[in-house]
From Swiss-Prot:
Cofactor: a divalent metal cation
Disulfide bond sites: none
Protein name as annotated: 3-octaprenyl-4-hydroxybenzoate carboxy-lyase
Lineage: Bacteria, Pseudomonadati, Pseudomonadota, Gammaproteobacteria, Vibrionales
Chain intervals for the UniProt region annotation (Unknown insert): 460-588
Pathway(s) where this gene product acts: Cofactor biosynthesis; ubiquinone biosynthesis
Origin superkingdom: Bacteria
Length: 617
């Protein structure tokens, strides 16, 4: 099923019980975040706040708060059908000519869909029913959400930013967070490798000092919104891909103040320019990692016109510790990624980006291994094939018999098949998300690959001396005794599947260097010395037996090369890796550490008191 605009989609969701209208007055400052966060974590509906306090424009949140609604937005009934979308993209990325008449017939549905890809240009559109310009331009009239108490300013989150570089025919659509700093100015935070930033860079080279035209659309139809977050081939526009999803051409109209084409059905559109010489400090904001990011300088977008539909809807969201809406999108788009990767690497059986790993910082791959060293080739492929994975810090590769989405199964493969030292790969000074405060410097850090596949003869020949499995299995693990080894230890978890070879240790860390101090004490215990291969050390705020907590700590609090301790194996001691997933003190790092997002107890209590009245769940 396809949807011509956002309102058509909302009507469909409401009929299915997937949209809740909130008539009670709610403040866009913090209250909407608290309500939306609770709803998303419970798998609840999209929310339409019809009476935002101080504003006349309703606010839509949690639109893509379940993977099922993402699938609906892409015209699919079930999440598993998103694999078909990935197959289309894989084909469009590297199309193959038909091998014969039957093959041509099989490809016919794709060819028919491709015919719907060009845009349909309109002379008039609903998104320009109302036009503000000059002194009328005023973001204070739009209910822009403030998400967390320590955020520096209100934040625009779901805008489709439309740009065109001077050397390209097609436009780029991207979603970048935007900090409100005045009634007609926002800060455009886009990473250097993203399409909008690349277009601006090319513009500055060709037209130095000249203003760069930009339009930002809020509340487009779901296919166009989701097209902007999907790994579309560079040769294909997001509008064309949206037409492919929808089964009909994307309708666009020219902006009133520049030549950029915007979604004709959008609810609100900001138009203006970026002065290449105008920058401002962006942040800090609570983001998808669960922490506040550092301040960074980014370009300022000056708004000259705001156009909108009559009685528009403002589409918004929040970002915070997973799960949040970006994490849910990541789970759904995971199904799209699999066929794209399989096109290049047919040996891949499954690919999983766990949402608790901030959606992209860790990947688990299962594969049909065909030769020694094959797992390392797949690791390199993941890091290099798609831009979406250039910031993935950890890649774990397992055999096809392993369930990539089950941490017990993955850990079992790690403990059974890995020499922690020889089967781990570290690469330093690689591109890293600038929001990753655990990296040594902004934008540059290390990556780690873990080969948890069953080893072939050539690989075993490199293993050298190892502890006898039969001997090690006879040594029991006494968790209570281990807790008493060091006073800083508050809890220890040994997964049943790991046979004592993997443990999670919680400590009450109070100063630098205590992780190493604790594990060195544990290494003196014979059972740990002989059997253990992996230790994850976490702070006391992590649940030792909760994989979501553990993976979140590893992916947010570690630089793999700096924070992984190693000990080589011998005939009397197993090789070991220690993941120091604790918060770091100034002596242990070279940049400012992240501040965790914390909820205001008074706000939580206020929403508690009103929760039943909302009737959301």
């Amino acid at each position: 099923m396809s949807f011509k605009d956002l309102r058509d989609f909302l009507n469909h969701l409401e009929k299915k019980g997937q949209l809740k209208r909130i008539t009670h007055p709610v403040d866009p400052a913090y209250e909407m975040t608290e309500i939306s966060d609770r709803t998303l974590r419970a798998g609840g509906p999209a929310l339409l706040f019809e009476n935002p306090i101080g504003y006349d424009i309703p606010v839509l949140t949690n639109l893509f708060g379940t993977a099922e609604r993402v699938a609906m937005g892409m015209g699919r009934e079930q999440v598993k059908e998103l694999r078909e979308v990935g197959q289309w993209l894989a084909y469009l990325k590297e199309p193959e000519p038909p091998k014969g008449f039957k093959d041509a017939l099989d490809k016919l549905p794709v060819f028919k869909q491709v015919l719907n890809m060009p845009v349909k240009r309109l002379r008039k559109a609903a998104c320009q029913e109302v036009v503000w310009q000059g002194e009328e331009v005023d973001l204070d009239k739009i209910p822009v959400m403030s998400c967390w108490q320590d955020d520096v300013a209100p934040l625009l989150t779901w805008g489709l930013t439309i740009t065109r570089g001077p050397n390209k025919k097609r436009q780029n659509l991207g979603i970048y967070r935007q900090q409100k700093i005045a009634k007609n100015k926002i800060i455009m935070r886009w990473l250097a490798h993203r399409g909008g930033a690349l277009d601006l860079r090319d513009w500055m080279e060709k037209y130095p000092g000249k203003p760069f035209p930009v339009s930002v659309a809020f509340g487009a139809d779901p296919a166009t919104i989701l097209g902007a977050v999907t790994p579309v081939p560079d040769t294909l526009s997001e509008y064309a891909f949206a037409g492919l999803l929808r089964g009909s051409k994307t309708e666009v109209v020219k902006s009133v103040s520049n030549d950029l084409e915007i979604p004709a059905s959008a609810e609100i559109v900001l138009e203006g320019y970026i002065d290449p010489n105008e920058y401002a400090d962006e942040g800090p904001y609570g983001d998808h990692t669960g922490y506040y990011n550092e301040k960074e300088k980014h370009h300022v977008f000056t708004i000259t016109h705001i156009t909108m539909r009559k009685e528009p809807i403002y589409h918004s969201t929040y970002t915070g510790r997973p799960p949040d809406e970006p994490a849910v999108l990541g789970v759904a788009l995971n199904e799209v990624f699999v066929p794209i990767l399989q096109k290049q690497f047919p040996e891949i059986e499954d690919f999983y980006l766990p949402p608790e790993g901030c959606s992209y910082r860790m990947a688990v791959v299962t594969m049909k291994k065909q030769y020694p060293g094959h797992a390392k080739r797949v690791m390199m492929g993941v890091w290099s094939f798609l831009r979406q994975f250039m910031y993935t810090k950890y890649v774990v590769v397992c055999d096809e018999s392993v369930n990539a989405r089950d941490w017990d199964d993955v850990v079992k493969a790690m403990t059974e098949n890995m020499n922690p030292i020889l089967d781990s790969l570290f690469i330093e000074s690689t591109p890293i998300d600038s929001l990753d405060f655990a990296s040594p410097v902004a934008g540059l850090g290390s990556k780690m690959g873990l080969d948890a596949t069953i080893k072939w003869e050539a690989e075993l020949a490199l293993q050298g001396a190892t502890v006898s499995t039969e001997f090690a299995s006879q040594i029991g693990i006494d968790v209570n005794a281990l807790k008493a080894v060091h006073p800083l230890i508050s809890d220890i978890y040994v997964p049943a599947v790991a046979s004592g070879q993997f443990m999670v240790v919680k400590i009450n860390k109070t100063h630098a260097g205590q992780c190493k101090e604790v594990v060195e004490s544990l290494w003196q215990v014979e059972s740990v010395k002989q059997r253990n291969k992996f230790i994850v050390v976490c702070d006391d705020d992590v649940k030792a037996d909760d994989w979501h907590d553990i993976i979140w700590a590893i992916t947010t609090r570690m630089d793999p090369a700096r924070d992984t301790l190693k000990i080589d194996g011998s005939e009397s001691c197993s090789a070991k890796l220690v993941f120091d997933a604790t918060n770091k003190y100034p002596e242990e790092i070279t940049r400012e550490w992240g501040k965790p997002i914390k909820k205001d107890p008074k706000l939580v209590a206020k929403v508690d008191a009103l929760w039943q009245e909302f009737g959301i769940l």
